[in-house]
Amino acid sequence: MEILKYLLILSLPIIALFISKKYSAFVDSILERARGYYLFLCHIERMLGSYLTPPHRLGDGFSHPSLEDMMMRISAGDSLIDAYRACCGSLPSSVDETLTEFFSDFGKGDVSLELRRVREAISRIDAALSVEGAEGEKQKKICSVIAPSLAIGLVIWMI
């Protein structure tokens, strides 16, 4: 029975470190997905600024690991909002609201209106990314301190 106690004591810090690393990777993946959408909107802005592109061709020439499913859906003929809803994943709420609004109304105006809307969406997402990036770093630091501290506290309590 004593050996199980010591195995548990040894495993708690390792488990805490694992949880901390997993949470950090989760936060990073959310921010990376949001950055991917930011880059996609920049790509749409360039496409609209240079020539008229049908919606199913907006993903041409764009590649981002987080958005591969969405690009396949767009090239298959899904509307931007349908492709986004099917593939959006976890995103900060402000980014999700901006993208939902933009993709829902995309193609309902002339080129100048669409350019204005995409530039507005880009600036809103850029602002959200800077806020969410700083907040994500804080959350990762807190988790990297709290999880091992709790593990150490449990180890001390068990001894």
Give the predicted meaning of each segment:
Residues 16-19, 23, 97, 104, ...:
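Generic signal for short, ordered secondary-structure residues
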Residues 105-149:
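Membrane-interface, cytosolic juxtamembrane amphipathic helix immediately N-terminal to a transmembrane helix
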Residues 37-38, 80, 145:
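Short hydrophobic/aromatic segments of transmembrane alpha-helices and their interfaces
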